[in-house]
């Protein structure tokens, strides 16, 4: 569990920092939803190996990045967990027209530590009602798409009123995951991409049926503030490629129809 705590604590600290320094040569500044942490770290390493370009990533909640970009935050690319945020930036003239792309659809899971008495894989929703589950961590639904999906799923399962006083909110989905890993919460409704990561894959989990919440459609877009538009286009091209898609799939993301090398903007 110490490895889980350390990895997630580092992610939360990273997500709380807004990178403001000037980008170095061929360094692409990316604002990315926290659910992408492990997938994008791997994808970025392969992208750099193939192109020689580096990405400088800040992780956080999509809603917070949306607000920061509206206020002039200097990023080249937004990788949002909710495609509506980049869509709104395009309408507002803050993003490059025609670059919006739905790169993945996210999934949520009930996750508990490996030593938990309850097993959500066997109990499903009932795992959240087990004795000893005093706190349930989710991302803040006010600005985190995974938090909104968690609340919707709880409502559709008919247990929201039973558990709402036990909900604890992370600033983003990574902080919600840290709450469970550290023992501050006994269960969490988390992104499958984080539950599939090396620090968390040994935990107990149950994939929440996708029809219990609106699809978590994730969108990428190049911003008007981009200083390296060529590099930003190269990054999105790699994200759409078969190699990029395979990495996303390995972390539990579902690729949209037409994803892969021949994908087009949505």
Q: Model-derived features: where do they sit?
A:
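Exported/periplasmic ABC-transporter solute-binding proteins
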Residues: 26-59, 63-73, 80-83, 87-96, ...
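Sec/Tat signal peptide C-region and signal peptidase I cleavage site
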Residues: 21-25
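Bacterial N-terminal signal peptides that target proteins for export
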Residues: 1-12
